[in-house]
Amino acid sequence: MPRIYRVVGETATGMRFRVEVTAEKPYDAVEKVYSLIGSRHKLSRVQIKIREVAVVSPEEARSDAAKLLMAVDRVVRY
């Protein structure tokens, strides 16, 4: 069952970030953040430092996208 993870860190340029993603495991959440931050800001994995990964309840989540994904109980493909 997917959970919402809040990943906190900073980049080599000094930019701090807090991203909420849905994932099965903390490792998957970190991989997704590396992909998102790296593609948005043209950074490699070495330039992204992850400080904290925590499970967040849907009520505590700040990201509307993460809340909506947790509300979906099934996906139908036509």
UniProtKB/Swiss-Prot annotation:
Which ranges form a coiled coil?
A: none
Instruction: Write the signal peptide boundaries.
Output: none
- Per the UniProt entry, the disulfide pairs are none
Q: Which UniProt key words apply to this protein?
A: Ribonucleoprotein, Ribosomal protein, RNA-binding, rRNA-binding
Q: Could you tell me which SUPFAM superfamilies the record lists for this protein?
A: RplX-like
Specify one Pfam family. Ribosomal_L18A
Which terms does the record give in the GO molecular function aspect? large ribosomal subunit rRNA binding; structural constituent of ribosome
Q: Which GO BP terms apply?
A: translation
Which is a Gene Ontology cellular component entry for this protein? ribonucleoprotein complex
Asked if the keyword Ribonucleoprotein belongs to this entry, the reply reads: yes
Recorded family membership:
Belongs to the eukaryotic ribosomal protein eL20 family.
Subunit text: Part of the 50S ribosomal subunit. Binds 23S rRNA.
Official protein name in the record: Large ribosomal subunit protein eL20
Q: Which organism is it from?
A: Pyrobaculum neutrophilum (strain DSM 2338 / JCM 9278 / NBRC 100436 / V24Sta)
Source gene?
rpl18a
